[in-house]
Design a protein with these regions (language model features):
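Short acidic, gly/pro-rich beta-turn/loop elements at beta-sheet edges
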Residues: 30, 41, 53, 142, ...
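Low-complexity, glycine/alanine/valine/leucine- and proline-rich hydrophobic stretches
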Residues: 335-336, 341-352
Length: 357
């Protein structure tokens, strides 16, 4: 433990970008240490795009390793610089100040209570993640009104002791947006999911949605726990192109899915209501899209879009992600496209920036 504390103090003193690995969770936090106490730390974190994404409190007992140097950190430093150079929308950075000589965990909970911040908690010996609003903070007890974006009927009051809390995420982009949206979310009523599962109805349903405002979710056969949320852009003879929304309600690129791989279309759900509200709030704040992206692309429904997208990616050396019939996930870029074959140059996330330069 002493070596971990020494590493954390070094990262704080030298303002080093670090990866913090946890003992009980696979989530790795990347960022700058802003406060170190005898029981925990505050880490100002960044998302995968290099954008400030709030902060996290980590109990010292939850920290397994502090990494100072790696390809992943070099990659993230490049992304952070790119986000600054391209003036990415940054609405979720750490703004709170903390005293390292006082109980950090209690400071975070008290700030959240006073400022009505949405938090994400991880508890000891509990694999669940809890999102909610702090409703009370006492010496040995904290109450949290849970929020469930997927089911508005499942939002109980959680009472726990502070010593059971290992991780607290706060002020991140998604959590901040949830806080802004909360008064509006509380006015929305629960809706039972409306879905289309009959494959014969997929094409007519999707064609009716082309170019329209309603958000839908597409659920693929290969992983029915995975789903894509967005608006239908184009329907071809064998595929559908969707303008995606990410978890913060911003434009998140495009996905092309074969109709034969589609398991279900979700037309109504509580989560779709939530994402629609997030998207509307982003528009009102003039933050619907990052400046380097283009959400106005049109695609020819009469063209084989699978071949067209692969040929274009090869021509411009664009990074794409492929999902094969057997569920294999590949990230990289194609070349030598011709006939029914092409060469795919697979890379990992740590290589993306070097390829993209």
């Amino acid at each position: 433990m002493n070596s971990i504390v020494n590493d954390l103090n070094r990262a704080l003193a030298q303002h080093l970008l670090v990866n913090v690995y946890q003992t009980n969770q696979e989530v790795v936090y990347t960022g700058y240490v802003t406060t170190v106490s005898d029981t925990g730390i505050i880490l100002a974190t960044y998302d995968d795009y290099g954008i400030p994404d709030g902060a996290v409190f980590l109990d010292l007992t939850a920290i397994d390793e502090v990494e100072f140097s790696s390809d992943d950190l070099d990659n993230m430093a490049f992304r952070i610089q790119t986000a600054q150079d391209e003036q990415f929308v940054q609405a979720g950075g750490l703004t709170l100040q903390f005293d390292g000589h006082r109980d950090l965990k209690r400071q975070v909970l008290s700030h959240a209570w006073v400022d009505h911040l949405v938090l994400m908690l991880v508890l000891k010996d509990d694999e669940h993640f809890y999102e909610g609003i702090v409703t009370s903070v006492a010496a040995e007890q904290v109450s949290l009104q849970l929020l469930n974006k997927f089911d508005y009927t499942d939002q109980p009051l959680l009472t726990l002791t502070p010593k059971d809390i290992e991780v607290i995420e706060f002020q991140g982009q998604e959590l901040t947006l949830q806080g802004i949206a909360l008064p509006h979310l509380q006015k929305l009523s629960h809706v039972a999911p409306t879905t289309v599962t009959d494959a014969d109805q997929f094409v007519p349903t999707l064609q009716q949605l082309v170019g329209k405002e309603p958000l839908v979710a597409l659920v693929p056969k290969h992983n029915r726990e995975l789903f894509f949320v967005g608006r239908i852009n184009t329907v071809t003879a064998d595929g559908v192109i969707m303008n995606l929304l990410d978890m913060t309600g911003q434009f998140g690129g495009y996905t092309l899915m074969r109709l034969s791989e589609l398991h279900e279309i979700v037309l109504k759900s509580d989560y779709l209501q939530t994402m629609r509200l997030f998207a509307l709030l982003n528009r009102a704040r003039q933050q619907p899209i990052q400046p380097v992206l283009n959400d106005e692309r049109l695609f020819d429904a009469t063209v084989d879009q699978f071949g067209a997208r692969i040929s274009q990616a090869a021509a411009f050396r664009t990074i794409i992600r492929l999902k094969l019939h057997d569920g294999t996930d590949l990230l990289g870029f194609p070349s030598q496209v011709g006939g029914q074959r092409f060469i795919f140059h697979e890379i990992d996330d740590q290589q993306v920036d070097q390829v993209g330069q």
